[in-house]
């Protein structure tokens, strides 16, 4: 009689993921270990008055390893929408070239949403991957208003890197913070957010 090999103990991270999946099954939904990172650039802060002018997407695993880099899209908007930008947006989006990219783009908001969803469906199941980013609640507000199908594709839970930053500065003030450079272009901002969360994982979540 051959005895089965002893089962290896699960790591804390694997055990936590198993618990999350079991909870998901018991409630009729699943939580994937794949994370959806989205960053938007907008003409302002109000989703009822302003529009999206750039979107970028990355999928990582739960250890923040990049699995795939999605489309980085400047979205065409008419001049009447660009004219709604305040001085801050005009200054920064002129300097980083985004306004020119928007004017030259032939991609509509609807097409940008479709392309992003096509990318995500290759790597994620609908409703199973958390939406991640810096101040991601603001991005979700714009997605809900302007790209609702994409917003619904993401799990309703989020990982907000800005919240981790604020808590770490208050609870662990002696730990070195993370200086995230930002040119206010969507893809660069996403990559910076991933690096920032990786920094807190190594320095805070030990």
Region locations from a protein language model:
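Short, flexible loop segments at boundaries between secondary-structure elements
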Residues: 155-173
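Amphipathic alpha-helical interface surfaces
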Residues: 108, 112-116, 139, 146, ...
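Short, low-complexity, polybasic intrinsically disordered segments
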Residues: 143-159
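Conserved non-catalytic scaffold segment of RNase H-like nuclease domains
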Residues: 22, 27-38, 42-131, 177-180
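Intrinsically disordered, low-complexity terminal extensions
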Residues: 15-27, 125, 198, 202-205
């Amino acid at each position: 009689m051959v005895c089965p090999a002893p089962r290896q103990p699960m790591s804390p991270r694997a055990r936590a993921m198993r618990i999350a999946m079991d909870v998901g099954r018991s409630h009729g939904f699943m939580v994937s270990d794949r994370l959806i990172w989205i960053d938007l650039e907008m003409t302002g802060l109000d989703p009822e008055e302003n529009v999206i002018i750039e979107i970028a997407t990355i999928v990582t695993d739960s250890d923040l390893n990049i699995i795939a880099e999605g489309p980085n899209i400047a979205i065409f908007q008419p001049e009447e929408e660009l004219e709604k930008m305040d001085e801050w947006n005009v200054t920064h989006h002129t300097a980083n070239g985004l306004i020119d990219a928007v004017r030259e783009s032939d991609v509509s908001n609807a097409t940008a949403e479709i392309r992003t969803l096509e990318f995500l469906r290759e790597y994620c199941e609908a409703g199973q991957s958390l939406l991640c980013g810096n101040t991601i609640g603001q991005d979700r507000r714009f997605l809900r208003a302007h790209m609702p199908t994409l917003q619904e594709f993401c799990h309703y839970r989020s990982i907000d890197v800005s919240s981790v930053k604020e808590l770490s500065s208050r609870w662990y003030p002696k730990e070195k913070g993370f200086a995230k450079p930002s040119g206010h272009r969507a893809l660069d901002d996403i990559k910076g957010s991933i690096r920032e969360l990786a920094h807190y994982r190594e320095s805070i979540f030990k």
